[in-house]
Amino acid sequence: IVERCHLNRNTFYYHFQDIPNLAEYTVKSWADQIIQNNYEFGSPMTCLVPLIEECNQHKKAFQHLYNSSQKDEFITYMNHVALHIVKMFMKQSSHYVLRSEQEKETLIHFYKCLMIGILIDWLEAQGDYDLKPFVEQIFHLIETTIQAH
């Protein structure tokens, strides 16, 4: 990395602890940019569609990280990124403003776990199914189940 970017090691380690820290920073920056470019969130699905499209575009990079010797670190920082994304969504979504703090925390935890579970399943399947229709179906099932009760 330092050779390719024409940096010395001290400069790199001044900004980042290690390569997983750099990867987490990169993915968070990438997610923030997607969120900012798609600011108007109506539902969790409208938040996730741009992220899903980006995951599909960067499938090989995600698979490489997931299948690497640093799989545990990758999953850990994806948990951090998913939590970050869900919290950003919650802060910007008017649908959740009136919820109690406990309800917000529960919803944040639920959506984070849902995102990570879907991502890990997709990576385990080597990305051989299209994430977008799969996630759309999940949210449709969630909505219709909630409306039925």
Question: Could you say what each language-model-derived stretch is?
Answer:
Residues 26-33, 58, 62, 84-93, ...:
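A short secondary-structure junction motif
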Residues 4, 99, 106, 124, ...:
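Cytosolic nucleotide-binding catalytic cores of signal-transduction proteins
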Residues 50, 71-96, 102-117, 147:
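Amphipathic alpha-helical packing segments from all-alpha helical-bundle domains
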Residues 1-21, 54-57, 61-65, 69-84, ...:
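Basic/polar phosphate-binding segments, predominantly the helix-turn-helix DNA-binding elements
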Residues 38, 62-66, 93-96, 122-126, ...:
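Secondary-structure edge/capping motif, primarily at the C-terminal ends of alpha-helices
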Residues 36-61:
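Hydrophobic alpha-helical connector segments
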Residues 113, 121-149:
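C-terminal peripheral helix-coil segments that are non-catalytic and often amphipathic
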Residues 3-6, 13-39, 49:
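An amphipathic alpha-helix adjacent to DNA-recognition modules
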